[in-house]
Amino acid sequence: MDIADQTFVKKVNQKLLLKEILKNSPISRAKLSEMTGLNKSTVSSQVNTLMKESMVFEIGQGQSSGGRRPVMLVFNKKAGYSVGIDVGVDYINGILTDLEGTIVLDQYRHLESNSPEITKDILIDMIHHFITQMPQSPYGLIGIGICVPGLIDKDQKIVFTPNSNWRDIDLKSSIQEKYNVPVFIENEANAGAYGEKVFGAAKNHDNIIYVSISTGIGIGVIINNHLYRGVSGFSGEMGHMTIDFNGPKCSCGNRGCWELYASEKALLKSLQTKEKKLSYQDIINLAHLNDIGTLNALQNFGFYLGIGLTNILNTFNPQAVILRNSIIESHPMVLNSMRSEVSSRVYSQLGNSYELLPSSLGQNAPALGMSSIVIDHFLDMITM
């Protein structure tokens, strides 16, 4: 075996060991050897390298099954920090996490304007805040992940965001040049799907659909544990599937799109009156007070969600559909209405092979997904 091959094998072994330590901390060298199939000298050598790189440290002795007590190893989650930011139509939600995805700092900002220039200024201010407040660590800031609700191409450029009307914006390059760290731009629903897969309701599933219901509707698709982005990177725009070919015109240029009937914007529109302009929080409050008009609107909201979800289930046949929406997460009526509609329409052979679940991460799902994408890249680079 030549030197290049030896180096490659060492890096593969290092990656395998780091993955096991990350998953099973605290763990002994002997247990690592048993779980990976690597011999003890290889484990010892590669663990020493990981310790020199500040990725792993020893925490003392574990229980013995006979003989000397083993020295236990732990993944150093504080070796560096990652920024994940979710840019919505009218908000920015940002987090700073350690290498295990634990949130260390967070910040939420309401957007008075969603112009790209103003949004970028707020983004930079938020990132600066995280950097100045970030704890000391061997690797410092390892990267920044930002998601937006719209079309992202394979070069991670923002092609179009229907509800804030951004077009052809290279946010990645400008942020990367400013901070000199890896930057990742992703679709918001893809980021949410990844967040739920790594940390949330989809942790134990390999094939899931994540549905983000806010001003519009986006879906993130995970097939066999991998994000599916499509040929051009534009998969998941199911909010713009037609459910009424004679319906009203959508901001995307089409007619009768699903999100015109089943988004937060559609729900608000159905309840607005000339006398009073309701906020989304007003609807949540009225629902908890059992206001008849609001409950009827929520029933209808669940009905239209069920129509679209039936199409998604029949198309993808996932193990679970994870739904991110504050009303769905807090009020059972919408979920019940939706489940009823789906069960009456979905392809009968699907039976009980799927679950409809509210998000367990709520508004932090996309930001956590972006932070996790950054961490994955960092851990890959460390063992390259």
UniProtKB/Swiss-Prot annotation:
A GO BP entry: D-xylose metabolic process
Q: Which InterPro entries match?
A: ATPase_NBD (IPR043129), ROK (IPR000600), ROK_cs (IPR049874), WH-like_DNA-bd_sf (IPR036388), WH_DNA-bd_sf (IPR036390)
Q: Does the keyword Ribonucleoprotein apply?
A: no
DNA-binding residues (ranges): 29-48
Q: What Gene3D superfamilies does this protein map onto? A: 3.30.420.40, Winged helix-like DNA-binding domain superfamily/Winged helix DNA-binding domain
Molecular function terms, GO-annotated: DNA binding
Q: Which UniProt keywords apply?
A: Carbohydrate metabolism, DNA-binding, Repressor, Transcription, Transcription regulation, Xylose metabolism
Family affiliation: Belongs to the ROK (NagC/XylR) family.
Q: What gene name is given for the protein in this entry?
A: xylR
Protein name in the entry: Xylose repressor
Top-level division of the source organism's lineage? Bacteria
Role, per record: Transcriptional repressor of xylose-utilizing enzymes.
